[in-house]
């Protein structure tokens, strides 16, 4: 072409191109247009970094406070394991997230989960990871000024069904040792019969076996409980042997629920593949946090299995679990004990939960988790001596039992 100037306008250029190339040009033109919001997205929070973390032990929980260079902090609830181990573990894991962008939540979850091949998936790591993950979601929600459930896809319901309401009745536990005799089974049946009478024909009756009843005995018991229309039998067996759960499902017609002692999608998947649970009960503080619980819900959805989340956390953990629950389609009922002092230890949190006349609680507030922590009170309580004793159950003959 030599010295000649080539003066093609965009229309002339597109006219000389093939259809596919023309399409690409038009798309590029649209994307680059100054008035297209999608073409001008600026991540205003790309400069935010994690700068510090404080772990405070107030029985029975360890509370994590994750700090950022923007002055926004996030809170996490670490529970269910020995605080004498989990607190220093959290402080050790901080080196993996220090200086990172807290909104890279999935990336940081994977970084911690995969960091050490020999403790990957173990309860101490996963419970600690759950608290860190919870705090990161709290930060993200506060950054964008929205409740966490908005970041999880938005609400799928207007309110959340819970148990432990004003109408709820908790029947005292049965004897710790189950002989399997007809008399022992009859004693438990009488308790369930009494519960059904108190809540009426439309109330929900649930039986928690707490992994403490031998399979053969539970099969007999479940048969005797059929007339009382149980919503589910919880924790029918100790996790770890899927064959036991398969046997129970084969012989028990009442829906079976479990999952509070299982962690991440990897431990939940066998229940679904073998079709031996009707309801999954992940605990947000046990299973890897908000990130993990959301994945479990999606996994269960593919099998049309609803969640009935286990939750014996502080108000922080309750809020985290409710945020996930607000965003998932397959849901049954949520464990809920906010009036118990153990869920607001020493009164360090400010959060009001209002249960309506039908037994539902409203969607959790925001921004973030929506929980206010009295840091002065937390610091005061954290300076006091804290104690912990390993739980356990011993039978009358001195042997050790599951519980």
Model-derived features with residue positions:
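N-terminal secretory signal peptides
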Residues: 1-8
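N-terminal export leaders
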Residues: 8-26
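C-terminal segment of N-terminal export signals and the immediately downstream linker at the start
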Residues: 27-60, 66, 73
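Metal- or metallocofactor-binding catalytic centers and their adjacent structured scaffolds
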Residues: 69-146, 402
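Shared catalytic-loop signature of beta/alpha-barrel
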Residues: 91-95, 100, 107, 223, ...
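Metal-dependent enolase-superfamily TIM-barrel catalytic cores that perform enediolate-based chemistry
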Residues: 159, 163-251
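Extended hydrophobic packing segments that form well-structured cores
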Residues: 369-403
């Amino acid at each position: 072409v030599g010295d000649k100037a080539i003066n093609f306008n965009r229309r002339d250029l597109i006219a000389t191109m093939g259809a596919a190339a023309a399409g690409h040009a038009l798309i590029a033109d649209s994307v680059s247009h100054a008035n297209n919001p999608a073409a001008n997205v600026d991540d205003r929070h790309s400069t935010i970094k994690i700068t510090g973390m404080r772990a405070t032990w107030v029985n029975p929980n360890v509370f994590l406070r994750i700090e950022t260079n923007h002055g926004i902090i996030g809170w996490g609830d670490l529970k269910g394991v020995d605080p004498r181990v989990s607190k220093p573990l959290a402080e050790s894991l901080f080196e993996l997230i220090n200086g990172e962008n807290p909104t890279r939540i999935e990336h940081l979850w994977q970084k911690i989960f995969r960091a050490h091949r020999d403790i990957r998936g173990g309860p101490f790591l996963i419970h600690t990871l759950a608290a860190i993950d919870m705090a990161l979601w709290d930060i993200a929600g506060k950054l964008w000024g929205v409740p966490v459930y908005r970041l999880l896809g938005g609400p799928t319901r207007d309110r959340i069904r819970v148990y432990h309401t004003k109408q709820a009745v908790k029947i005292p536990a049965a004897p710790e040792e189950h002989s399997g005799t007809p008399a022992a089974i009859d004693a438990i049946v009488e308790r369930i019969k009494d519960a059904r009478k108190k809540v009426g024909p439309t109330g929900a009756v649930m039986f928690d076996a707490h992994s403490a009843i031998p399979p053969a005995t539970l099969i007999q018991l479940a048969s005797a409980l059929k007339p009382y229309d149980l919503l589910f039998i919880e924790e029918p067996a100790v996790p770890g042997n899927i064959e036991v759960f398969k046997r129970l499902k084969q012989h028990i017609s009442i829906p079976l629920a479990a999952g509070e002692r299982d962690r991440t999608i990897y431990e939940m998947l066998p229940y679904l593949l073998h079709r031996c649970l009707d309801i999954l009960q992940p605990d947000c503080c046990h299973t890897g946090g908000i990130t993990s619980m959301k994945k479990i819900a999606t996994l269960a959805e593919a099998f049309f299995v609803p969640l009935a989340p286990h939750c014996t956390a502080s108000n922080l953990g309750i809020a985290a679990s409710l945020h996930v629950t607000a965003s998932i389609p397959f849901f049954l009922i949520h464990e809920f004990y906010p009036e118990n002092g153990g869920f607001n230890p020493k009164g360090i949190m400010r959060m009001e939960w209002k249960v309506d006349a039908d037994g539902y609680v409203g969607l959790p507030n925001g921004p973030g988790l929506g929980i206010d922590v009295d840091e002065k009170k937390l610091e005061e309580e954290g300076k006091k001596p804290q104690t912990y004793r390993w739980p356990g159950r011993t039978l009358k003959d001195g042997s050790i039992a599951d519980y």
